[in-house]
Amino acid sequence: MKPLNVIFAGTPDFAARHLQALINSEHNVIAVYSRADKPAGRGKKLQASPVKMLALENEIPVYQPTSLRDEQAQAELASLNADIMVVVAYGLILPKVVLDTPKLGCINVHGSILPRWRGAAPIQRALWSGDTETGVTIMQMDIGLDTGDMLLKTQLPIEDSDTSASLYEKLAEQGPEALVEALTGLAKGELAAEKQDEALANYAEKLSKEEAELDWNKSAAQLWREIRAFNPWPISHFSHQDASIKVREAHVSQSKSQAPAGTIISAGKEGIEIATGDGVLTLLNMQLPGKKPLSVADILNSRSEWFTPGTVLNSTKEAE
């Protein structure tokens, strides 16, 4: 097998982990593309991306065009004469002329089993929708949004304890291995591309802070999924006592209740039970404004009067 000459394009830490795997592999990373340095910290000094820093540590040339629609940037990329371009969380749109420049085109590492979740938030939407598994897809890029042919897929069971943060970490380990395996398969001519089934495709919309507000009229199971999906950002929350209270951990209770949605059923060291549109949700870990996350037991030590059974959350008229 002849090692491939690879251009790598990426920006955040997730991408840097994939670059490290390529550096450690038998393939040759001949250039790295990354977003422009951004002001960071109190001094607003320009901060290089994790991908750029890793490239410089390994003496790999770094390119930071503001756009790849620019003819000069396109000519510069073409002059590198790469076999393939690997794109992981880069942040710039690749026009068709760039996708067609490397001999084997451009491939992408996507954080879901395509075509299940295309778009910006596949990890979060898998949790949000109650999927039992996720994974990584290595995909041949085309001009569509995550619509290209699939080259290699991995699978990862979603555990009840998983949050978006934990799945991100697991996929950040799976992705680099899958990427190197795919490149080696392409170099050997052993990978067969598979078309995506459009009928199975969903768009994973970006998350918003507004979406993370807990709606007690939803089922306990759906609220539990949302709390996990929105951790570490934007964190599920509800308004109570003129405060926005974040919920970092919860589970679906075995308790039953006929109380209106949002009613506190019980409050003790085991958790705060809330009636929902279907079932009961137990809150386990919360965060009051300006405070660090605490177990419900610790919060009740100082704020028990906020969570008296019978109180209705998100209600203008709370129980006496």
Curated annotation (Swiss-Prot):
TM ranges: none
SUPFAM superfamilies: FMT C-terminal domain-like, Formyltransferase
Function in brief: Attaches a formyl group to the free amino group of methionyl-tRNA(fMet). The formyl group appears to play a dual role in the initiator identity of N-formylmethionyl-tRNA by promoting its recognition by IF2 and preventing the misappropriation of this tRNA by the elongation apparatus.
Organism: Shewanella woodyi (strain ATCC 51908 / MS32)
Binding site for (6S)-5,6,7,8-tetrahydrofolate: 112-115
Alphabetical UniProt keywords: Protein biosynthesis, Transferase
UniProt-listed NCBIfam families: fmt
Origin: domain of life: Bacteria
Record's keyword annotation contains Zinc: no
GO cellular component: cytosol
The protein, known as: Methionyl-tRNA formyltransferase
Keyword hit for Protein biosynthesis: yes
Enzyme Commission designation: 2.1.2.9
InterPro entries hit by this protein: Fmt (IPR005794), Formyl_trans_C (IPR005793), Formyl_trans_C_sf (IPR037022), Formyl_transf_N (IPR002376), Formyl_transf_N_sf (IPR036477), Formyl_transferase-like_C_sf (IPR011034), GART_AS (IPR001555), Met-tRNA-FMT_C (IPR044135)
CDD domains, alphabetized: FMT_core_Met-tRNA-FMT_N, Met_tRNA_FMT_C
UniProt similarity note: Belongs to the Fmt family.
Catalytic activity: L-methionyl-tRNA(fMet) + (6R)-10-formyltetrahydrofolate = N-formyl-L-methionyl-tRNA(fMet) + (6S)-5,6,7,8-tetrahydrofolate + H(+)
UniProt-recorded Gene Ontology molecular function terms: methionyl-tRNA formyltransferase activity
